[in-house]
């Protein structure tokens, strides 16, 4: 049956979501180029979309994890441990790539501006302390402030408690999870409009003029992220699944990375990743935990940002760096990156911590942070796209490897 009287509705239902997002992206660029005043006004649509994603993500994670654990049957296997290992290996590998690239293509900064009133963490111990305090946060406050470490802790605890509840209670949790998931699907259907508003307003406000003075630094940063996305991550996945990893890599970048690039929020992209995992047919008990956990600790992009900007400051100040110190920086950057979600300002405000390894004073380090905020239009977008798409990639790789191992047994 055809509906000639509704061609627009017919086109929307027949075109894939990714295709619609690409159309929204192009339309946003065109509007920003020719009608910048109008582009600034439609930015409100993008803000509404990101706010909707951020609003639904904490509730989705809480309900989904709690229902998944409560309904977990004895004997079912989850694959969280190998995924955690992949997260750590991926983050450390990204830091090593950033160190090598920074030595091969050293960047110089113009350190003159100040980013204003900020409070970077004082050391690694403070970052770890912040993470621990996040675990024992009040559950209501965790939901309100989108503290996903706290949300996970309470969801896991309640899920374990509800495993001893009646079948009626556990079925209610499953129905609640399905209801929240349906709301998420509705929100995600508005992604093309959201991307249109975000792209239009971003390019109308900043354009590319503000980035020209930092072209070399951006090339190193984005080059590292692309190298990790298309070389390092596929290599890690290949070692895990023993087949061509690129179909899976490209699917994750297309379906997850593209949305994350424009929302610039790993938390906002959690619903997108969970839906992608469902379409890939992954183990729900696994991905319902690994995806929100990955949004918190899987930070390859943050490790690259911290390392590249720190070594750019080191090169600018003429500080000599030996190999052991570079290795130590990789470790520190990896640990800092894992704690980036627990720090207001994310990876950029952890740069002073890494700079302290080289005796760089806080005043200079905060000027490096200011440079980070100037290039954040691209740096933050690319960082989030790499972080978020890798969550799905490593989850899928671990699930496939464990399934292959189980079938061979």
Curated annotation (Swiss-Prot):
Source organism phylogeny: Bacteria, Pseudomonadati, Pseudomonadota, Gammaproteobacteria, Pseudomonadales
Gene Ontology CC annotation, any one: plasma membrane
Keyword Membrane attributed: yes
Protein name, per record: Serine/threonine transporter SstT
Main location: membrane
UniProt keyword terms in alphabetical order: Amino-acid transport, Cell inner membrane, Cell membrane, Membrane, Symport, Transmembrane, Transmembrane helix, Transport
Encoding gene, per UniProt annotation: sstT
Summary of the function given for this chain in its UniProt record: Involved in the import of serine and threonine into the cell, with the concomitant import of sodium (symport system).
Localization annotation: Cell inner membrane
PANTHER family per UniProt: PROTON/GLUTAMATE-ASPARTATE SYMPORTER, SERINE_THREONINE TRANSPORTER SSTT
Segments traversing the membrane: 17-37, 49-69, 83-103, 142-162, 180-200, 218-238, 301-321, 331-351, 357-377
InterPro entries associated with the record: Na-dicarboxylate_symporter, Na:dicarbo_symporter_sf, Ser_Thr_transp_SstT
Gene Ontology molecular function: neutral L-amino acid:sodium symporter activity
């Amino acid at each position: 049956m055809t509906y000639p009287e509704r061609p627009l509705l017919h086109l929307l239902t027949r075109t894939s979501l990714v295709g619609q997002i690409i159309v929204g992206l192009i339309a946003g660029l065109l509007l920003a180029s020719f009608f910048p005043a109008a582009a600034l006004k439609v930015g409100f649509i993008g803000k509404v979309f990101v706010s909707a994603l951020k609003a639904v993500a904490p509730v989705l994670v809480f309900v989904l994890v709690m229902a998944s654990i409560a309904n977990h049957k004895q004997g079912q296997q989850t694959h969280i441990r190998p995924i955690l290992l992949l997260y750590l290996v991926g983050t450390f590998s990204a830091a090593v790539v950033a160190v090598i690239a920074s030595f091969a293509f050293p960047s110089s900064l113009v350190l003159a501006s100040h980013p204003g009133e900020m409070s970077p963490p004082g050391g690694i111990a403070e970052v770890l302390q912040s993470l621990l305090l996040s675990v024992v946060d009040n559950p209501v406050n965790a939901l309100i402030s989108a503290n996903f470490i706290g949300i996970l802790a309470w969801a896991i605890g309640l899920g374990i408690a509800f495993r001893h509840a009646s079948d009626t209670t556990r079925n209610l949790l499953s129905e609640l999870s399905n209801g929240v998931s349906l709301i998420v699907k509705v929100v995600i259907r508005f992604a093309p409009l959201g991307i249109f508003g975000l792209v239009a307003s971003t390019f109308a406000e900043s354009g590319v003029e503000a980035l020209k003075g930092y072209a070399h630094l951006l090339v190193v940063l984005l080059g590292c992220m692309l190298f990790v996305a298309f070389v390092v991550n596929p290599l890690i996945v290949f070692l895990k699944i023993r087949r061509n990893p690129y179909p899976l890599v490209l699917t994750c970048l297309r379906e997850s990375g593209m949305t994350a690039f424009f929302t610039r929020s790993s938390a906002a992209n959690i619903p997108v990743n969970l839906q992608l995992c469902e379409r890939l047919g992954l183990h729900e008990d696994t991905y319902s935990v690994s995806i929100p956990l990955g949004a918190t600790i899987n930070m390859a992009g943050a490790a690259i940002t911290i390392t590249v900007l720190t070594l750019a400051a080191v090169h600018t100040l003429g500080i000599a760096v030996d190999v052991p110190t570079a290795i130590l920086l990789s470790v520190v950057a990896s640990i800092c990156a894992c704690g980036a979600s627990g720090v207001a300002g994310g990876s950029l405000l952890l740069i002073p911590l890494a700079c302290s390894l080289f005796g760089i004073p806080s005043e200079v380090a905060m000027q490096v942070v200011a440079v980070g905020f100037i290039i954040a239009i691209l740096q933050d977008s690319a960082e989030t796209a790499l972080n978020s798409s890798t969550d799905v990639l490593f989850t899928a790789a671990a699930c496939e490897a464990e399934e292959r191992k189980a079938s061979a047994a």
